Amino acid sequence: MATSMATAADARDPRLSKEAHATQQPTDVQIEQSILHADYGHDPNVSFEEYLYYANWTRDYEKTLSTKGRGMSSLLSVLSGKKQQAVVSGVPEPVTAPSIEARANDTSKKPDDAPTDTFGIISDYEWHHASRAARTATWGAVFYLITTDILGPFSVPWAFTQLGYGPGISLYFVFAAMAGFSGVLLWWQFLGLDSDKYPVKGYGDLGFRIYGNWFRYIINILQSGQFFLGVTLLIVANGQSLSQLSQGPKGSKAFCFTACLIIFTVAGFIVGQIRTMQKFGYIANISVWLNVFVILMTMGIVANSDPNYEAVYASYQIPKGPIKTSAGAPSDLTFIDNINGLMQAVYSYGGATMFCELMAEMRRPWDFWKGLIVADTFIFLCYIVFGLVVYSEQGQFAFNPAYQGINPYAWQTVGNVFGLITGLIAACLYGNIGIKVLYANVGRSVLRLPALESRVGKCVFVATVPVYWGAAFIIAAAVPQISNLSAFVGAAMILQFSYTFPPVLAVGFNCLRDAVGPGEGFDPATGRVVRRDEGLRRWVRGYRKRFLVNSFNVVYFLGAATTAVLGIYASVYSMHRQYAHANIKPFSCDSPTG
């Protein structure tokens, strides 16, 4: 995630002029990358057919690119933190783009709505090279980035305590398969709408180009909420780590839990003042391997020690007793408990939010499916192996996160220290991105603030960081229930990006694309779009072209939406129930780990 966001984080405002480009040699194109993040993708005057036209042109060019040494072998450059050099081999056949005059003479558009045409300043050649320079990632690198962003199996054993062996394995497999299918849907839409001229830079761009601004706003709001509550969850988890660390090997009285949350929050907004993320590259790679070590360590320790009965009783009110496992759903649990366990699977596969950003940096986005399938399979196997090992050894006493449920204090300390390091890095990255998303969608679009790279923008960023972290702390201290809170985040936000939005976007994409009949489409010579009808009739005609596929996606969408509603209800109900019967209270000194 850190790697994929580095370019956006460091982008500066372009200083472009006709004179500068008039003297520039065509072999030395120096266009700053921030121009690729401009609002050309949100121009309401650009039609769906125009996006399709230039996307087909870009895909045809990408077929000519060599793939030698661009697969799994490219992982070495990612692991070492080295940025691959962009290779732009030749220039595709020039396309006659609509001129400013042609757009101005187009009576189908209102003069007041005509956008400022930056393409009149930047030549097609320069635009092509500037766009290609930002695309260097390979499918091997994408496999690594998806894996490191999603891989985090520490809630899987607790999910098995709520589901049992059979339902747990089955549901994790189903959600892995459907997450892969959703990724393929997003990949297909990206190929059809992304181009060097109109690059797709994020999930919201797909929503805008298919359904309009209202859908983009929904996506941006949910993305902002996901990043914010991601920081909140990390504050709770690492507050628990600090609480366990403060107890010492003899189990003495721990620090006040709310104080532990404050300590991590203060550390977070101090480190979070780093505005750019390039410096996080090596640190983020180190944190990945620390995470892998904690996974292996936890599996080894649970096989040779007792569970942490004190922590389990403090959080779940399960008294010490014989270890039990269940082939099916445990008989002493309710449907609400099963749904909360299911939401851990949703949370575990929450990587679709970043798929568009990864494809936007790929040299050949067509190859994305390779990295997706390999990563999805690898992550599923890791989750199942880790979940089965820990659940088989600890049974109903499996804790969330799992490394806090091991009993030897020395190894528990190792897990907590490494967890603090990786958690602080992850929280700072999520906070950094979350603030930038808010600034772009509220500060820039609504309040008309200057660019983040400006002096005012930097001051606003610095002032926003403590407010952002302070708000996350308030929620963390008010709801210190990591399992129920993660279930809520999974149901309300992550499930939408991984399962609800992809099929509904696919239906819209198919309808708009298949509605284009003979003699219709975009004319690059005039900039006009020829359509013989508009409105509902056009959508119905497009839907019928792929009736079975579209109908399946509608059913998939309705199923995902229903699951989201059930998950939100179950998580909120469980929060209320735990407050009524557990020792965990808001803003309390009592720790969920005992």
Language-model segment annotations:
Residues 136-154, 263-265, 344-351, 559-563:
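The first (N-terminal) embedded transmembrane alpha-helix
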Residues 128-151, 161, 221-225, 462-463, ...:
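Membrane-interface recognition of transmembrane alpha-helix starts
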Residues 1-133, 140, 144, 199, ...:
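Intrinsically disordered, low-complexity terminal tails enriched in acidic/polar residues
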Residues 159, 270-274, 474-480:
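Hydrophobic alpha-helical transmembrane segments
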Residues 274-282, 484-485:
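Membrane-interface helix caps and helix-loop-helix hairpins in membrane proteins
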Residues 157-192, 196-200:
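Extracellular loop-to-transmembrane helix junctions
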Residues 134, 138, 190-223, 232-260, ...:
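Membrane-interfacial loop- and helix-cap regions that link adjacent transmembrane helices
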Residues 227, 283-289:
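Cytoplasmic-side transmembrane-helix entry/capping segments in multi-pass membrane proteins
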